[in-house]
Amino acid sequence: MEIFGTDKAFLPLTLDKACKDDYTALTIGYANLLAGHSDPKGRSIMYMEAGRQDKTKYSRDSMVRAIWYMLHAAMESEETQKYGILFITFPAGVTMSQVDRGLIKILLPSIQGTIPIRLSAFHSCQPPAFLKLVLPFVKLFMSERTKQRILFHMGPTEKVRDKLESYGLTRDNIPQSLGGNVVVDTKAWIDSRLAAGK
């Protein structure tokens, strides 16, 4: 209710109803569901590119709704319902001012225990040095189970890609920014779902 407000809380979670005002947050490229891609178990992949955040273009609630929408879209897959979802974050290039602690404070508690989806793994690839300062704050809002599923992959892109491959994430399921073959085009995916009334 807090995130969607009384005017949207009971509307269908579709792009033309509950998320009708969230197009910018959905398409800015911060949160991306890699539709059609999964790990060997069938877990959907959410790709977070922190350097694309721009708090001046959307509200925190709008971004939370956008991520909720993508997580619910991921749950359209039976494998994701069974085995969960994994996150790949690519915070390289993000500045300290782009880290939105307020968004984290709203987002993590709203997802954990609310959305019926398992968080299988959280792969943070090439994190900036200042992440050591931010991570303790982020962990305040994570369940113990989630904290145990955070993995850090440092080094050059090739090394990171090889590490992801050791977890079953092949080039065909890794974004190009991390040495994979996936072209991330969330705007096209959102536009196709909007046209389909989803």
Where do the protein language model's features map onto the residues?
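Basic, amphipathic alpha-helical/coil surface patches used to engage anionic, phosphate-bearing ligands
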Residues: M1-K198
